[in-house]
Amino acid sequence: MRQAEQSGIVYLADRAIKGLPINFGYYNNAMVISEDELTDNMALNADVILCCKNKTRDYVNTLMREDILKIKTQYPTFNEPLICRKNNWNIEVNGINLVNGLRGIVRNHPDITSIRKDLKEMTIDFLDDGNNLFSQIKMDLQYYRAPQDQKEYLKRNPYNKADKFELAYAITTHLSQGSQYSHGIFMEEFLHRDIMP
């Protein structure tokens, strides 16, 4: 088990698995609050925001980027969190490949000179959460800007070789499996019976 036994996260996870109620309050290194108590500052200071649904993830990413951080450009910016969405086994740094679910931040200052191929690609430097710098990555801007319902088609397009990334202020719990974060926020959502145990 990754979390220490006295961890509030372990305690809360155990209660959730057993179907026991979870009340608002502090649990050692974790706290449970209502959605209306979540502040912009809490969201800004979190390493990641975990959501159960893509729709919520997209909403939170847009909220963080446009409303809280006031980022106006349609392109990723310096220090902005991204997550890789398609494996590229040909790119490796320190034994780590650029794979689906790899999260990190943009480490260069992308400008107009980094955009190419009719505004469909952008060159970025990507620093993953393990401190591995992937330099000069050709990012697929068409995929990055596409609505969720078009992304799967773009991912499977054999003619588009650029690497697929999405915003990652918030990610789904599915993509976070195996990851560790010091300061995360989990947004509880109703899931269909066939998803929950």
Protein language model annotation of sequence segments:
Residues 1-35:
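Conserved coupling/interface region of RecA-like P-loop/ASCE motor cores
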Residues 32-45:
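Conserved interdomain hinge at the start of the Helicase C-terminal
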Residues 4-7, 48-197:
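Core RecA-like ATPase module of SF1/SF2 helicases and allied nucleic-acid translocases
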Residues 12-16, 41, 63:
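Residues that form generic nucleotide/phosphate-binding pockets
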